[in-house]
Amino acid sequence: MGIWIGERISTEDHPDKTTIIIYPKLEGWKLILLTVWVLGFTFIGIVMIYLLAGGIYNLEVVADNVEDWRDQQLVYLIVFLGFWLYFEFKTVKALLWYRFGREFIRLDRDSLTHKRAILGYGKSVKYFYDNIKSMHPFKSDSTSFGQFFENAYWSLGTDAVIFVHFNKEKSFGRRLDEKTTKLLIRFIEDKVKVLRRKK
């Protein structure tokens, strides 16, 4: 049986590897609101797609120049649907992440393997220890609009652990608090030392 780091990280030791699972940060009332928002937003998008696909011509319009009015509405619908698609993608992905997402980390004798998965589907990326440099907590900037936007509940959130791999920053640990992040980094460093001695 493994140990827990904070409330969201479970670990399990095996003979030649250690596995870590990071669960999403769940806040019940926010998850309910996000679900309602996604359902409402999806309904609005479906109505707009119907109008774009020809429903606008079935509307009875009282105006002097009906064709100009309909052309203006088509432009509005196309612009609206462009924004709608972007936010629909972001919110549905976030909702699926909160409900079914996990981060899997496997530490073995040679490498750290990281996988972000929703319903078990995701891409695993292997990082060899010899190529990993400077694992440290992400330094947040509370005055950054981009970071505020990224950490809104309807978005996936910022990763808490940063490391350098072949001169590129890589990261994992979505929405971990500072204390848990430091404990996770220490845990990983300690386990890597033990596993590398077993070579």
Where do the language-model regions lie?
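Non-transmembrane, membrane-adjacent beta-strand/coil modules in membrane-associated proteins
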Residues: M1-I5, E12-H14, L26, W97-G101, ...
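Cytosol/matrix-facing amphipathic helices and coiled-coil assembly/linker segments
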Residues: P15-I21
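Short, structured motif recognition centered on aromatic/hydrophobic residues
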Residues: I20, W37-L39, I105, G157-F163
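Alpha-helical transmembrane spans
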Residues: Y23-R102, K182, R186, K198
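A signal for specific C-terminal beta-sheet/loop modules enriched in small/flexible residues
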Residues: L34-I44, G122-P137, L183-V192
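Short C-terminal domain-edge/linker segments immediately following a structured domain
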Residues: F43, Y50-G54, M135-F138, S144-G146, ...
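Cytosol-/stroma-facing membrane-proximal "stalk/adaptor" domains immediately downstream
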Residues: G173-K199
